[in-house]
Amino acid sequence: MFQIPVENLDNIRKVRKKVKGILVDIGLDSCKELLKDLKGFDPGEKYFHNTSWGDVSLWEPSGKKVRYRTKPYCCGLCKYSTKVLTSFKNHLHRYHEDEIDQELVIPCPNCVFASQPKVVGRHFRMFHAPVRKVQNYTVNILGETKSSRSDVISFTCLKCNFSNTLYYSMKKHVLVAHFHYLINSYFGLRTEEMGEQPKTNDTVSIEKIPPPDKYYCKKCNANASSQDALMYHILTSDIHRDLENKLRSVISEHIKRTGLLKQTHIAPKPAAHLAAPANGSAPSAPAQPPCFHLALPQNSPSPAAGQPVTVAQGAPGSLTHSPPAAGQSHMTLVSSPLPVGQNSLTLQPPAPQPVFLSHGVPLHQSVNPPVLPLSQPVGPVNKSVGTSVLPINQTVRPGVLPLTQPVGPINRPVGPGVLPVSPSVTPGVLQAVSPGVLSVSRAVPSGVLPAGQMTPAGQMTPAGVIPGQTATSGVLPTGQMVQSGVLPVGQTAPSRVLPPGQTAPLRVISAGQVVPSGLLSPNQTVSSSAVVPVNQGVNSGVLQLSQPVVSGVLPVGQPVRPGVLQLNQTVGTNILPVNQPVRPGASQNTTFLTSGSILRQLIPTGKQVNGIPTYTLAPVSVTLPVPPGGLATVAPPQMPIQLLPSGAAAPMAGSMPGMPSPPVLVNAAQSVFVQASSSAADTNQVLKQAKQWKTCPVCNELFPSNVYQVHMEVAHKHSESKSGEKLEPEKLAACAPFLKWMREKTVRCLSCKCLVSEEELIHHLLMHGLGCLFCPCTFHDIKGLSEHSRNRHLGKKKLPMDYSNRGFQLDVDANGNLLFPHLDFITILPKEKLGEREVYLAILAGIHSKSLVPVYVKVRPQAEGTPGSTGKRVSTCPFCFGPFVTTEAYELHLKERHHIMPTVHTVLKSPAFKCIHCCGVYTGNMTLAAIAVHLVRCRSAPKDSSSDLQAQPGFIHNSELLLVSGEVMHDSSFSVKRKLPDGHLGAEDQRHGEEQPPILNADAAPGPEKVTSVVPFKRQRNESRTEGPIVKDEALQILALDPKKYEGRSYEEKKQFLKDYFHKKPYPSKKEIELLSSLFWVWKIDVASFFGKRRYICMKAIKNHKPSVLLGFDMSELKNVKHRLNFEYEP
């Protein structure tokens, strides 16, 4: 802001004096007039003596000025202020109960403003009054009405995203849905008269209670006639404002500027229809675009077979449907609107289907599918789909599986947009084909899947594709009948193994090869086996294997198209006919093959038989037919496959159904070609996979990347998998508030202030104790925690509110059981502490921790015969990393070598160490340097107590030698003493050294020869001072005094030597400070600070006492003095 400069200051100053005099005269006159008035009024001596100066004065000049109170709630009667409204109300009730009406403050419900009730009411009317929506309707040419612009205020729940435009409805939703545990503290029902009447007259007694007194508020005893009235009182009364503050914390307010309001149609316009008739006669149901339609057909044909169910998007959680029909077997979910050019979708309801009942499932149990995903693709879509719709996966409840499903009349082509339903099986019942089977790349030729063909339900393959839907070339031919568990259609993996036009190598199974029945693909099962020859012709580029299957498996003997892998199977005795459906309750256990090829399952074993390499297949369980009462599964042993010459076949005889499966002869053509995929993307993927090769570290064999993992699991982990199948691991959840997850494979203990490695994690957890999530109990053993969880908290599968409200999560399945998606740590405990079973621990941090995801730990029992179990290290020295078998040897080592002994901190209740001489407990970071400094200054310690920490007497010429654990180690990266920059004097290194915590690792130093590689770099720098070298005699010549006679002396004598040295040479060099610190086992910073402190004392004494010096001394010595001298001449 510009200001005009002031001129004529002299004249203005002269005028000021006159103005001041005039004002003084005016004030004096006014005071005289007031004095005359006061003399005329005399209240008396009583009031004069009872009046103090503070009653008439405006402010006290001698008192301190009251500071501005920055907190929002300030008391006007005193100096109190606070940030919380409840604290302010408590203050008023305690100290100003009489004047509470003057200072009562209430908050604004819509903002942070708080004041007296009248002021808040005026504030609310001014700033938060609801805008009256005045709708000015204008009539256009068509006669339709348009509403004016209006701003809609909506409220949203932050926990479940529920939204509403009414604030009261929003508060009611939050209270009922998310704070339901608070309802019991407010809702009360008067039952005095009910207790006096007998049980048969309960309804009469309730009627006798007057309506206003039936319900009451437990907080303020307000009466209400109904639950809604009581709810309105709780949510709107000013008495329960604290409850509103809780509810408002999870409510978000949004102002939507909608412009012109959308038109509301009383009758919807005609839209695309979705019909689900029973037999083609049911009328189609009208639908609006923003709705989903669920067609629920019946098993029995009836006019009302299709019952439409409409789910509106506008009302979340609401479901309106017509009366459901009984005996529903499946559900069809269709997305609306349909593609362009299609007006309806017709689905024929299935006939009563035979179901396969697993063991323990009732015979008449109906299929009850859960909610289905909408338009979920089966596999990767390589090309544009056009107007066709991908199939939907139907989920079937475990234990019930329909075996046949008619596709409907498909002799004629169906228009685009047909939505077939391909039911898949829930994991645990049957294993469906992995994604990638249905690849939208080529159209299905005509004539595939004629009318009336039966396809097994649950087989998620192109066998259930209706013409018009795109699929791969591997589709079942005309008239082919496939039973589930025999062959998934579309298995075209051989084209991804070999490049185009290249013959299969010798690793492909040759003719006459013997394959045990258990060595099939991981998801393929064979009931029993017999031997049949190959009599099927193979087209160009087709790999064909002849797999004989007996007893309970339907044959597949149809010709296949290019790119399809087919197993030609013949039927032996006790085999169901082709057209015979499986009866409910039959004892066949059918599964699916994987979508990968047989060639992918060939795993080289690295061994040869007669010069021919052998291969293995992934092991799989074999199902044997048993009586209808149950199912039996036998795990076959893993056996290699021998490549025999072509034509060499071993005769086989049919085996009994109950006997184990004998080997199966698998014959193949002598020259087998594999046709590659025509698409460039598949070719690039094959070439990319072929470039990735890995070497097995066990057998030194080279494998492709897609075979290496399977080889490791099969060839080198078979014994471990066998042992793991015996007992199911136990899954537990616990709390460890003393741990902090730092990074991968590393955690930090907040109590001990140290890092804990993977090997010591479980011992550290048990040392501090694992806390129960549901109660304050703490356990120091796994067995105690397991028994406590089974006995006290059996059935509790949800986290407590303290954890769930803060965002802690545990992975659980549908039944509430713990899931372990990965393992962060794998540790070992002895069997006597753990038991026979493995234990999976999901460990959560404390309630106030920032890490919300648990750490998953697997604890395995240590076998008695495992190497290293007899010589297990019980304890490890945290200073020199020496292993000790017994606790006595460990404590003796600490006592003799480090002059400490383990103890427990009396306040922190954490492991600590104490001095054996003075019994003082070490606090902070424990290092050898801290022990050495304490021993030097400890009055109870003997003078030669630090001899164990000193190096052996001798002469070290090389400055690159480092002393670690009493042995001389050569390391060029470390120096004898820490080299410090100018001016730092070791403070920075000391700070860094103290920040580095010790690492507890039992396997850190198995021997003395590995000590230098294990000790951290910062610790070596810290301990280099305590493990100092022996200094040369030549280096001592630079010192002003000889320190040899003070070695091994007490701390006071060494301090006296430093004083003498200061009087001799008050300004030592850096080299002298380094030598003095290494000789007296003290820090260089301590030596430098000692000399600096003495110099400061001398300079202060010179300044205060002013010493004088007579002439006649050596003037050349003045050059060595660095402080100024004042020469005073005295005549």
Curated annotation (Swiss-Prot):
It holds the Pfam family ADNP_N. Keywords: DNA-binding, Homeobox, Isopeptide bond, Metal-binding, Nucleus, Phosphoprotein, Repeat, Transcription, Transcription regulation, Ubl conjugation, Zinc, Zinc-finger. SMART domains: HOX, ZnF_C2H2. GO terms for biological process: nervous system development; regulation of gene expression. GO terms for cellular component: chromatin; nucleus. One of its GO terms (molecular function) is zinc ion binding. The keyword Ribonucleoprotein does not apply. InterPro entries: ADNP/ADNP2, ADNP_Znf, HD, Homeodomain-like_sf, Znf_C2H2_type. Residues 274-329 are annotated as: Disordered. This is Activity-dependent neuroprotector homeobox protein 2. It comes from Homo sapiens.
